[in-house]
Regions:
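NAD(P)H-binding glycine-rich loop region in Rossmannoid oxidoreductase-like domains
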Residues: 42, 52-89
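Glycine-rich NAD(P)-binding loop of the Rossmann-fold in SDR/ketoreductase-type enzymes
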Residues: 56, 85-96, 104, 115, ...
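N-terminal Rossmann NAD(P)H-binding glycine-rich loop of SDR-like oxidoreductase domains
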Residues: 7-28
Length: 270
């Protein structure tokens, strides 16, 4: 079990949108936070130690693992990525962080996976984490690979882990799909808090959504982990209607991954 009063937790990608939400949601109770990113980290609290570093700098990663009990891995490139950056950060960088954690004796890793790890399942199927991955893109493939890596670290080295298949993380839902897949800032902090506090999660994969009325997945691991999301995208339907968003028509995409499952890949990185 990770002790919020005494154990040091390292958050990578701490200057990003989710990293910032985690800082806001965790620092009141988690008293020893070590934060890292390639960008400056704004307004650190007294219990937040900041380190500017790149996950591709293995020596720096190994140094920052000193005294760390748990790693919350939120680093990653997405969107308009190049193939080179995808391999450098989402493959090699991820491996270096996991391996440095093992060498340092880290007890637990909380990993930002993605719903794009199962994005090719048809939307008619209520996907649970018990099903094998069906990634919808290279991005989703690397996220699924991270889950598989953590399985190996658990089986071979006993490192506990929770992989979070994060849905649409935004301050508010923006379209019909995100009414099902939204993960709010408050709920992402609650989910990570549960992943850190659980006495023994083993090697767990959970879907990272809020308590959305239109949710199209099924996850018994929420109850096991003690995750009780408080926010619901449905509360924002009037706002979206007022913006002219079609929230009542047929589902636009036939797969869970939405447009990712139909978008062309960029094998050359161009």
């Amino acid at each position: 079990m990770i002790d919020p009063a005494t154990d040091r937790v390292l958050i990578t990608g701490a200057a990003g949108a989710i990293g910032t939400a985690l800082r806001n949601g965790l620092r009141a109770n988690w008293r020893r936070l070590r934060l890292t990113d390639v960008r400056p980290i704004a307004d650190p609290a007294p219990n937040e130690e900041c380190i500017i570093a790149d996950v591709s700098d293995r020596a720096a990663i190994e140094r920052m693992m000193d005294g760390v009990a748990a790693v919350v891995y939120m680093t990653g490139v997405g969107g308009n990525y190049t193939i080179e950056d995808l391999f450098r950060v989402n493959a090699r960088g991820m491996f270096d962080v996991f391996e440095a954690a093992r060498l340092a004796g880290v007890q637990r890793i909380v990993y930002a996976s993605s719903n794009h790890a199962f994005g090719c399942y048809p939307i008619s199927e209520r996907v649970s984490p018990a099903l094998p991955p069906r990634p919808d893109s290279l991005y989703g493939t690397f996220k699924a690979w991270g889950e598989v890596m953590l399985r190996g670290y658990f089986d071979r080295h006993g490192i506990r882990s929770v992989s979070l298949r994060i849905g649409t993380y935004r301050p508010l839902p923006i379209d019909q799909r995100s009414l099902a897949t939204w993960l709010s800032p408050g709920d992402v902090a609650r989910l990570v808090d549960c992943a850190l506090r659980h006495p023994d999660p083993g090697c767990l994969v959970v879907n990272g959504y809020s308590n959305n009325t239109r949710i199209k997945t099924f996850d018994p691991n929420w109850e096991f982990l003690g995750y009780r999301p408080q926010d619901n995208a449905e509360d924002h339907v009037p706002m979206l209607r007022g913006m002219g968003v079609d929230v009542d028509g047929p589902w636009e995409w036939p797969e869970h991954g939405g447009s990712h499952a139909r978008a062309p890949e960029r094998p050359t990185g161009r």
